Amino acid sequence: MKKIAIDAMGGDHAPKAIVEGVNQAIEAFSDIEVQLYGDQSRIESYLVKSDRVSIVHTDEKINSDDEPAKAIRRKKNASMVLAARAVKDGRADAVLSAGNTGALLAAGLFIIGRIKGVDRPGLLSTLPTVDGSGFDMLDLGANAENTAEHLHQYAILGSFYAKHVRGIAKPRIGLLNNGTEATKGDSLRKEVYNFLASDSSLQFIGNVEARDLMSGVADVVVADGFTGNAVLKSIEGTAMSIMGQLKSAIAVGGVKAKFGALLLKSSLYDLKDTLDYSSAGGAVLFGLKAPLVKSHGSSDAKAIFHTIKQVRTMLETDVVGQLVEEFSKESDVND
């Protein structure tokens, strides 16, 4: 049985969206147990009772405006902290939260801990492509500043995730840059390019540009945390703007526009599904000793369900255990 600790109080729509997503997951997957951390009375008002769901009551939670490291240290009974502690103590196999991103990353690093050999775990998410296959990108903001060695390791981590979780036999690795030529970019990008090009274990396809990401140019895209986060926000903003403009145009376009939208209903839903990457799950802080997944703060029940599904897949494939073994081999070789 796969045991998942969930911060029920994190996110804009907690605990309602969190608990309703759990209800859906419990019905869909018979091999998971969920531990919900948070206000018991509020959780119970949305929970469909199941012997595979338990509640750990706490009145304390981490707010969106709390300073991450201080919050983790001072709010020891916060729902997020208790969920991470359950993983640390072996009472749960993975942790999920839609709460304060910085605090969750801090909980991952300070409570769960890094895999030996991983310098800086990267925040990885599967983002949309026009053909629906998606691509993995990291780092999406766990580390604002990176060295070339860090980005090389992100490529290794991303390739490992794409192989073991998404089932891609030979993931194509691209380095996000301001041009596709090998000579493009600043000194960091050039150094990273040389690292990746000389690593025979990676299927490195070279530099990729931001404009080509959603066309599926690569299976894994590597970036420093600052750049990766900016690209993520751009994709989110573009998707919301496109859907917003379509809705607005239909609303003010009169009868013809509404009739046209009705005829295109199926295609419009397909477009919405393509741009909505919540069905791919949340962002993984990959490189920790256990799966830690951040769901978007605005997640609804559907997004939480898909994030639980993602966590279940990570546990089913034992991707973290295999990653520990891989880095252990690498450490032995280096020693």
Curated annotation (Swiss-Prot):
The keyword Cell membrane does not apply. InterPro entries: FA_synthesis (IPR003664), Phospholipid_synth_PlsX-like (IPR012281). GO terms for biological process: fatty acid biosynthetic process; phospholipid biosynthetic process. Pathway: Lipid metabolism; phospholipid metabolism. One of its GO terms (molecular function) is phosphate:acyl-[acyl carrier protein] acyltransferase activity. It is found in: Cytoplasm. Its main location: cytoplasm. It is an enzyme of class 2 (transferase). It catalyses: a fatty acyl-[ACP] + phosphate = an acyl phosphate + holo-[ACP]. GO terms for cellular component: cytoplasm. Pfam families: FA_synthesis. Coiled coil: none annotated. Transmembrane segments: none annotated. Its EC number is 2.3.1.274. Keywords: Cytoplasm, Lipid biosynthesis, Lipid metabolism, Phospholipid biosynthesis, Phospholipid metabolism, Transferase. It comes from the Bacteria. The keyword Transferase applies. Catalyzes the reversible formation of acyl-phosphate (acyl-PO(4)) from acyl-[acyl-carrier-protein] (acyl-ACP). This enzyme utilizes acyl-ACP as fatty acyl donor, but not acyl-CoA. Homodimer. Probably interacts with PlsY. NCBIfam families: plsX. Belongs to the PlsX family. This is Phosphate acyltransferase. It comes from Streptococcus equi subsp. zooepidemicus (strain MGCS10565). The gene is plsX.
